[in-house]
Amino acid sequence: MTLDYDILVIGGGHAGCEAASAAARMGSRTLLLTMDMTKLANMSCNPAVGGVAKGQIVREIDALGGRTARITDRTTLQFRMLNRSKGAAMWSPRAQCDKGRFSAEWRHELENTQNLYIWQDTAAELLFDTAGE
C-alpha cells in the first residue's frame, strides 16, 4: 500500500463515501479509511432516503454529481410521496431501500472509481509537521 495520497477521508458513512467519490472524480488521489468495508454508507434501522430535509440534501448532492440518489434508485424497495394531504410545497419523495444492497452498491461504485482506494482500518491519531501540514 502506498501512502502517497492527495486526500484522506476518514469514515465510510454517507458523507464520507460522497466526499471520497467526489475528490477522486476530480482527479485527486484519494484514500477512504473505513472500519468495515462491508458497511460502507450503512443505513440506519429506518433505511430511507428522502423526506423533507434529507430529500433536499440528496437532490443538491445529485445536482453536483453525487452518487446517493443513483444508488437509491437501484436499491429502492418502496417509494412514497410524503405530506400529500398538505400543499404541494410540502410534498416530499421518500424511498425505502434494501440496506444490504445499498451498502453493496456503494462499495461497487467506490471500487470502480478511478483514483479512489479503500482501506479497512481505524485512525488512531493525526500527525502534523511543524507547519501544520
What are these regions (language model features)?
Residues 132-133:
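Short, hydrophobic/aromatic-rich segments at coil-to-beta transitions
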